[in-house]
Amino acid sequence: MRLHKIFYALFENRLSDNLEELVQGKKAVESPTAFLLGGQPGSGKTSLRSAIFEETQGNVIVIDNDTFKQQHPNFDELVKLYEKDVVKHVTPYSNRMTEAIISRLSDKGYNLVIEGTGRTTDVPIQTATMLQAKGYETKMYVMAVPKINSYLGTIERYETMYADDPMTARATPKQAHDIAVKNLPTNLETLHKTGLFSDIRLYNREGVKLYSSLETPSISPKETLERELNRKISGKEIQPTLERIEQKMVQNQHQETPEFKAIQQKMESLQPPTPPIPKTPKLPGI
């Protein structure tokens, strides 16, 4: 029981510090908006913030679950125990912190950005319903990125994090990425049908808006998203990314991993075929 009280006190202290830091330079508004973000792992959801900052003139608070994972009071000990699998052991803590922060800040009416993936519909529906009860307008902005690009994005992110700190680098299994890709279009269609979101938008990595339910309310986002997820990428487009990842993996000494071998195979497949060496014609009498 005493340990529970200590943990609760540590959590409340950290929550207080997080709230104080997040509200710096931000103002509560009379008619607040919450932006829920979606997109498969590696799609680059951070880039959605640019459009939102422009829309709110920067008066918005970003709540990113990942930033709270290392705040777990036993994080260092858990890293030693579980190494790169530590994420799943600290996620319950970061989820609790995220929920507490959303609750406290929404009570006061701050504009919010809430990161997610869109793997399920339950969480966005519950969040949007709760926020609307507090007077919020709710919107959903989703990354529409070809699945090969986002999968490579998960590998590059891991290699970059590994170079910085091998013990806390966050790996995304390909299966988790592919499940998100498979479910996202249907989930987004379900969310569109609920009518909970005043606007559902799709953006690519360049920040170009590909779809808005506000502009085309009778059209589901599913078709546009599926088309972009399955869009074929040319070798010219993908080669710089492959070369960049290969270089990082060599630096991290990850040449023996299945991912490295797959990257090399893909790069080899992009090389133009070697033309056959022409045969030297035989001279008469030789």
Swiss-Prot record:
Annotated function: Toxic component of a type II toxin-antitoxin (TA) system. Phosphorylates UDP-N-acetyl-D-glucosamine (UNAG) on the 3'-hydroxyl group of the N-acetyl-D-glucosamine moiety, yielding UNAG-3P. UNAG-3P inhibits MurA, the first committed step in cell wall synthesis, which is then blocked. Phosphorylation is inhibited by cognate epsilon antitoxin. Part of a postsegregational killing (PSK) system involved in the killing of plasmid-free cells. The zeta toxin induces programmed cell death.
InterPro entries: P-loop_NTPase, Zeta_toxin_domain
Known partners and oligomeric status: In the presence of the epsilon antitoxin, forms an inactive PezA(2)PezT(2) heterotetramer.
One Gene Ontology MF term: ATP binding
Region (Disordered): 249-286
This protein's UniProt keywords: ATP-binding, Kinase, Nucleotide-binding, Plasmid, Toxin-antitoxin system, Transferase
Catalytic activity: UDP-N-acetyl-alpha-D-glucosamine + ATP = UDP-N-acetyl-alpha-D-glucosamine 3'-phosphate + ADP + H(+)
Enzyme class: transferase
Family: Belongs to the zeta toxin family.
Parts forming coiled coils: none
Protein name: Toxin zeta
EC number per UniProt: 2.7.1.176
Keyword Transferase carried by entry: yes
Domain of life: Bacteria
UniProt feature, compositional bias: Pro residues: 272-286
Entry binding sites for ATP: 39-46
